[in-house]
Amino acid sequence: MMRFTKFYAPSLKEAPKDASLPSHIFLTRAGFVEQIGSGLYNFLPLGKRVLDKIKNIVKEEMDKAGAQEVNLSFITPASLWQESGRYNVFGKELLRFKDRKENEFVLGPTHEEAMLSLVKNKITSYKQLPLHLYQIGLKFRDEARPRFGLLRCREFLMKDGYSFHANEEDLGREFELMYKTYSQILQRMGLDFRAVEADSGAIGGSGSKEFMVLAKNGEDDILICENCDYAANIEAAKRAKKTCQDERPEANYASKFHTPNIKTIDSLAQFFKTNAFYTIKAVVKKAIYENESKLVVFFIRGSDDLQEVKAQNACSALELVDASEEELEKAGLVAGFIGFVGLKDIDFYIDFELENEKQMIMGANEKDYHLIGIDVVNLNKDRFKDLIEVKEGDCCVKCGAKLKQSKGIEVGHIFKLGQKYSKAMNANFLDENGKSQPFYMGCYGIGVSRLLAVAIEASHDEKGCIWNKTLAPFVLEIIVSNIKDEKTLEFANKLYEDLTELGLEVLLDDRNERFGVKMNDFELMGFPYALVIGKGLENNEIEFIQREGLVKELIKTDELTEILKKKVL
């Protein structure tokens, strides 16, 4: 019997000082998790029950999709990461260490290399493909600033799966299967989510989709079409090409105008009495690479803003940082007056929406001068990249309807890795013609421990957690208002046994505490339903409480089973 007096759920009156999000506040106060260090958490019985439910749903759906579960070592030899080329690319988030024999290892934040090593030289023929292996295990990412509780911690539980294919077409089939599988997982958990176009980040590859649970405290900005199914992370969002009805500025090609102290787009547009849409903005960044750094200039429409993740991908940098005034001066760049005409010895990229644009205004690479009448033509195609940040109100790239911005929390990510890792690690198989070919790979991750926090970010009130029936540690709590009343306690015990036999997960609050304390704990812990056994029992009545909205009603004891079957089971 699950009695509160025997159940370990140490609650706190106050939230941790660094807790700002509801999930962090309520999960620690209610005794689901306990923080033991920066970004490190213990899962207590309540949290472990939810975690197990999440894991079971993930496992059931992955197994149904034909994936096979394995369990890889938490520690990976550094040589595998060096072989793939990711050892230096991943940055300081990858925790590196040596054993007593000076052998180098890493704590795996992902396991592409380890999983590829597992099948390398064992899967040797196309006849053994496709193969999909997954695990649910610990990961470690040495975050610089762990925060927001389970949403950004250093050690976390993750489901990561990897598929191996003979060709790109079969990889596409598996990608679509995982899209459906992940959607089913999140639907079963009762979460409001969107699958969005995404950047591949340090993992690499193409064909990337993130699964975002909508929540007002979400750390990611996502754009959702009001009409069709298009949705994208702001880092990867695309739009229908913008147009402007205002007249273009008139001038001969590359006419040079004296524009004293005109350094901003607004002042430039005002000076030429035109729309900023017809100006070209230069954004200078210092691109950091493995063994060097250099200045890169990104040219975008004056009415747009640079999307830094897109810009970083365009120049294949590990990181972009702001360039200093000294660095600009050393490179011969004049801040506020930079243009691509005559720009020498500096890498530059142009937003692809500017290709073939006519009669534009741009810096002349000379202090206090701009060029007007610039045609963006006859340039190397490789210069044109998707660089701009798409915003709310822009038009959908698929159907042309308006895009709406929302907040989301990433809980899953699926990638088409292609042959990136298999080529780097020389992992091959023999195709139908007996020719050696690198595997085509897919990668599929779900943040299992993160989902526990996400569920509460998406469903809570000012009093505490609000769990749905699928994820709740207990579906129903029986609250005995006066534990010293033998008749009440006897009825509660019998009710507990009857409901357990019906298959309900029930917690019996038999503590010798004030009724107000018990109710506060119920509201904080957030079980979907409660039955209060109190004075009403004299009239054969019990109070039924629904946690969402704290809806209360009195029900007769002889109607209890039927009502619970309708509302709870």
Swiss-Prot record:
Q: Name one Pfam family in it.
A: tRNA-synt_2b
Q: Which GO terms describe its molecular function?
A: aminoacyl-tRNA deacylase activity; ATP binding; proline-tRNA ligase activity
Biological process (GO) annotations held by this record are: prolyl-tRNA aminoacylation
Tell me which EC number(s) this protein carries.
6.1.1.15
Signal sequence range: none
Broad EC category: ligase
Kindly give the Gene3D superfamilies that the UniProt entry links to this protein: Anticodon-binding domain, Bira Bifunctional Protein, Domain 2
Quaternary data = Homodimer.
The entry's free-text remark on domains says: Consists of three domains: the N-terminal catalytic domain, the editing domain and the C-terminal anticodon-binding domain.
The Swiss-Prot or TrEMBL record describes its family as follows:
Belongs to the class-II aminoacyl-tRNA synthetase family. ProS type 1 subfamily.
- Name of the molecule in the record: Proline--tRNA ligase
Q: Which organism is it from?
A: Campylobacter jejuni subsp. doylei (strain ATCC BAA-1458 / RM4099 / 269.97)
